[in-house]
Amino acid sequence: MENLDALVSQALEAVRHTEDVNALEQIRVHYLGKKGELTQVMKTLGDLPAEERPKVGALINVAKEKVQDVLNARKTELEGAALAARLAAERIDVTLPGRGQLSGGLHPVTRTLERIEQCFSRIGYEVAEGPEVEDDYHNFEALNIPGHHPARAMHDTFYFNANMLLRTHTSPVQVRTMESQQPPIRIVCPGRVYRCDSDLTHSPMFHQVEGLLVDEGVSFADLKGTIEEFLRAFFEKQLEVRFRPSFFPFTEPSAEVDIQCVICSGNGCRVCKQTGWLEVMGCGMVHPNVLRMSNIDPEKFQGFAFGMGAERLAMLRYGVNDLRLFFDNDLRFLGQFR
C-alpha cells in the first residue's frame, strides 16, 4: 500500500507541474494506461490472499479515480488557458469600420427586357424565342422581303453563306410560331439581333423585342391601344403618343411610333432635336402575304406586329446618351443600376 500511495503522489505531482495538454496525456498513459504503473499494481491482486483482495482492489480503484479526476481537472484548466490566450491574440476590434460586401445587379438592358416582358405578360402575351443563326427564308422570304430589298445587302447583314445568316430582327420567331400553331397567337419575342452598323446610337449587336397578335377581328385600333398602354406603363408617365405612316414589307398599313420626349416633356431639347418627339418603335397590321406563307387564312384572321430596340428604350428610361456604354463593361457605369 505504501507503494500505491507513493505512485499516487508521484502522479499528482507530475500533473500539477505539467503545462501542456500533450504532456498530460503522456502522464495518463504512464500511470493509467494498459501498461501503466497503477494498472500493474491492480494485476498484483492475484498474489494476495483471497480475503484481502476486495479491500486492496477497492483502494487501488480509489487511487486510480483520484489520479483521473486530477488529470481531467488539469486538462480543463490547460485547455481553458489555451483558449483564453488564443482569443486574446485573435480578438476583433469591433470599433473598426466594416469592409462591406459588394453586391451585383442586373444589367440595364436586362432590366429593360424583363420590364417589357412583364408589361406584355400581364395582358396575356407569351414569351417566344428562336435561333440567332437563321436561314434566308425565315429572315426574309417568309416576311415578304423581296430579293432586291436593301436589308439583304452584304453591308447590312452578316452572312455565313448564301443561305445562312445572323438574324437581323426577331421576326423569324414570329414566323416559326405561326408555322407551328394556329391562332389565336399572342407573343413577344426578345433576343439579340445583328446588323452591320456601329455609332453613338447603333451597335452591330443589339437587343430587340417584337410582338405579334393574330386573331379574328383584329384592327389597327387594337394595335394603337396596345402600344399606347404599353409605352405609358413602361415609362410610368401619361405620355403623348403619335403614329406616323411608314412602310415595312411585312406589315400593311405600317407606322412609326413617336412619344413625347421624356427628357424635355415635349418642349424641345438636344435629345429630341428640338422637335419634342422621340421615335421608339415600328408597327403595323400583318401583311396578308406573311399570313399566307405561314398557312394562316388572311380572310379569316388578322394580326398586328410591332418591334422595338431594348437599348433604345433603356437609353430613354435611364438618360444614357451613348449606346456603346451598355457594352463597355465599365463598373462605374453599371454600378449605377444596382
Curated annotation (Swiss-Prot):
Tell me the Pfam families matching this sequence: Phe_tRNA-synt_N (PF02912), tRNA-synt_2d (PF01409)
Q: Which GO terms describe its cellular component?
A: cytoplasm
UniProt entry tagged with the keyword Lipoprotein: no
Q: Which GO terms describe its molecular function?
A: ATP binding; magnesium ion binding; phenylalanine-tRNA ligase activity; tRNA binding
SUPFAM superfamilies reported for this sequence? Class II aaRS and biotin synthetases, tRNA-binding arm
Q: What is its EC number?
A: 6.1.1.20
InterPro entries, alphabetized: aa-tRNA-synth_II, aa-tRNA-synth_II/BPL/LPL, Phe-tRNA-synth_IIc_asu, Phe-tRNA_ligase_II_N, Phe_tRNA_ligase_alpha1_bac, Phenylalanyl-tRNA_Synthase, tRNA-bd_arm
Which cofactors, if any, are listed as required? Mg(2+)
The kind of enzyme this is, by top-level EC class, is ligase
**Keyword match Coiled coil:** no
Location in the cell reads: Cytoplasm
Question: Tell me, which GO biological process terms does this entry list?
Answer: phenylalanyl-tRNA aminoacylation
Q: Which residues bind Mg(2+)?
A: 252
What the record notes about the co-factor is: Binds 2 magnesium ions per tetramer.
Q: Which cysteines are joined by disulfide bonds?
A: none
Q: Which domain of life is it from?
A: Bacteria
Q: Into which family does the record put it?
A: Belongs to the class-II aminoacyl-tRNA synthetase family. Phe-tRNA synthetase alpha subunit type 1 subfamily.
What does the record note on quaternary structure? Tetramer of two alpha and two beta subunits.
The entry's protein name is Phenylalanine--tRNA ligase alpha subunit
The organism of origin for this protein: Pseudomonas aeruginosa (strain ATCC 15692 / DSM 22644 / CIP 104116 / JCM 14847 / LMG 12228 / 1C / PRS 101 / PAO1)
